[in-house]
């Protein structure tokens, strides 16, 4: 649960030049057998085995994330497929990731796990603006999902993994694939949706 990730505080450090973009892309996954046997609490007691395959859509990874520096010390979130945008200026706004139905719950929770809220940060900052000032830039995250959430293709989990992996690159956190998948599980606990481990592993590995 969230205790796991609160112990793992992060110390994000800008890892790109001002004109660079981190571009993360992932396929989605299809269950062949064993769906939901990966989901706690069942998997904790009985173990779980899932066979799945990763697929692309029209030859393109259907889930894409772009992260780039932003001149102002704030966080800008955009969704191309939903035509939505939100500007985040405070820790409180960033911590609104458990609001059901928000198009930006996943990137907000991912930013939290990357160390951009006090509970997950190694360093205490008086405000998000001050933290981004110390970080050296604001952050703009753009999401593109060619497949709707709730499609049964693991979209939300894999989008979460893709955002976390891209943030790891952008912030020099050096998370490997196992760490990204572990934090995806933590992210889903933060969003209170819960979930197993096969979705993110099916798309990331």
Name the predicted role of every residue range.
Residues 175-205:
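Alpha/beta catalytic cores of group-transfer enzymes, especially the acyltransferase/condensing modules
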Residues 156:
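Short, conserved phosphate/pyrophosphate- and ester-handling motifs at nucleotide-, phospho-/glycolipid
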Residues 1-153, 165-177, 182:
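ATP-binding N-lobe of GHMP and related small-molecule kinases
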């Amino acid at each position: 649960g969230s205790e796991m990730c609160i112990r793992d505080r992060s110390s994000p450090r800008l890892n790109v030049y001002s004109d660079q973009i981190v571009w993360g892309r992932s396929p989605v996954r299809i269950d062949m057998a064993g769906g939901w046997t990966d989901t706690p609490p069942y998997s904790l007691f009985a173990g779980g085995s899932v066979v799945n395959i990763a697929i692309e859509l029209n030859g393109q990874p259907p889930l894409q994330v772009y992260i780039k520096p932003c001149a102002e010390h704030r966080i800008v979130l955009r969704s191309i497929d939903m035509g939505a945008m939100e500007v985040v200026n405070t820790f409180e706004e960033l911590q609104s990731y458990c609001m059901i139905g928000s198009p930006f719950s996943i990137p907000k929770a991912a930013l939290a796990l990357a160390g951009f809220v006090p509970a997950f940060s190694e360093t205490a900052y008086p405000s998000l603006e001050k933290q981004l000032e110390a970080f050296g830039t604001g952050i703009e995250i753009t999401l593109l999902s060619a497949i709707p959430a709730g499609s049964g293709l693991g979209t939300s989990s894999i989008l979460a993994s893709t955002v976390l992996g891209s943030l790891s690159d952008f912030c020099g956190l050096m998370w490997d694939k196992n760490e990204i998948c572990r934090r995806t599980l933590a992210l889903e606990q933060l969003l209170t949706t819960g979930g197993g481990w096969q979705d993110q592993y099916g798309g990331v590995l």
